[in-house]
Amino acid sequence: MFGLGGQELILILMIILLLFGAKKLPELAKGLGKGMKEFKKAQNEMEDEFNKAMDDETPKKKDFGPDRE
């Protein structure tokens, strides 16, 4: 995860705690969770649209009957 170790994550969490205070942390976590959920949803929608567009552009193989030699 971004090349961060345990000590770096603890340091970042302590800085966030000092900046925003203990009372704001649940609100920040909730907002972060919602943001991540919306981002993941948008990412999935874009992937679905891309895959659909690629499927639509792929030429369909037509069946002309039995093979003749």
Curated annotation (Swiss-Prot):
Gene3D superfamilies: 1.20.5.3310
Compartments in which it is found: Cell inner membrane
Main location per the UniProt record: membrane
Region (Disordered): 49-69
Coiled coil: none
GO CC, alphabetical: TAT protein transport complex
Tagged with keyword Membrane: yes
Bilayer topology: Single-pass membrane protein
UniProt GO molecular function: protein transmembrane transporter activity
TM annotation in the entry: 1-21
Pfam families: TatA_B_E
Function: Part of the twin-arginine translocation (Tat) system that transports large folded proteins containing a characteristic twin-arginine motif in their signal peptide across membranes. TatA could form the protein-conducting channel of the Tat system.
Name assigned to this protein: Sec-independent protein translocase protein TatA
